[in-house]
């Protein structure tokens, strides 16, 4: 930031699915609203989505983690151990990339959404994560302290940690985000959704019984899509399946009682979801926050091997906020039985005005201004 120019911010979401990119949207908007100049560090899998939302913002191609999820449940913890060398290589590469772009383009602030190596000694570096506790299934619980120590070592490289949740338990992420100790200053910045604060005026012409939202990384995404199609086609009524393929543009087709969409812009997505009786989706944390903002009644189907999603689904079901079904048990019969038993579930709606995020951005901007 030189010669009175606006604070220059680079926002970098992790490329493990699109959820990290979508929850960065309100962060980008808030920095822009408060006068900062914002650019985006993207990979090929999230570039199209972010370009659709922010066509005016410059994008820089960042290193990709190239993650492929394990096919079977409860393997993610062991997968991380097995692929530790790959992660370290990417972290070192992205750290070099971060230092290079800060030196070349003079960024004042880096915002890393779960990118473990995206920090710089020459810029304020903010690490955003809801998963302060890295949870493992019971059979691998001995690894949990090791996972937390490793994550703490990652966070120590940053100047600040932002947690997309409310400060008080249970919040939306429960014990995953509410951990007593943190090695660096921590700020809760509220639930973050790309639909937050937006005036969503578009209305859907169709009242769907189920809207299925497909997301995640291959091959888990394709497997989930196939399962949802087989499940919903047997249920009377009209259903929509949003395939989670923004790189293909906005295309639609019909198969029997299913309306298929490759991708939907935010206004259309919100209209379809808000006009649905039920939404069936993965239980990723960004999806949970989006559905809370849109007031959806949800059936969450955790991605096999992602114990974080299993814990989130279990905790949300315990609080009466949502229904959860294991992918291995999802069928026409189990889906209909689950919603008949939990007809009154509802996610708590976040506050319309997220002052936690506003305050965090304001403090960041003014701390950098005062240091120059």
Question: Which residues does each predicted region cover?
Answer:
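Active-site-proximal region of nucleotide-activated glycan assembly enzymes
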Residues: 57, 121-188
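A donor-sugar binding/catalytic signature common to diverse glycosyltransferases
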Residues: 268-311
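Conserved nucleotide-sugar phosphate-binding/catalytic loop shared by glycosyltransferases and other
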Residues: 6, 15, 33-85, 259-260
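C-terminal amphipathic helix plus adjacent low-complexity
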Residues: 337-372
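Donor-nucleotide binding loops and adjacent catalytic segments primarily
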Residues: 28, 176, 187-278, 288, ...
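A short, glycine/small-residue-rich beta-strand->loop->alpha-helix junction that serves as a flexible
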Residues: 13-25, 219-222
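Conserved nucleotide-sugar donor-binding subdomain of glycosyltransferases
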Residues: 75-117
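Short amphipathic alpha-helix
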Residues: 21-31, 46
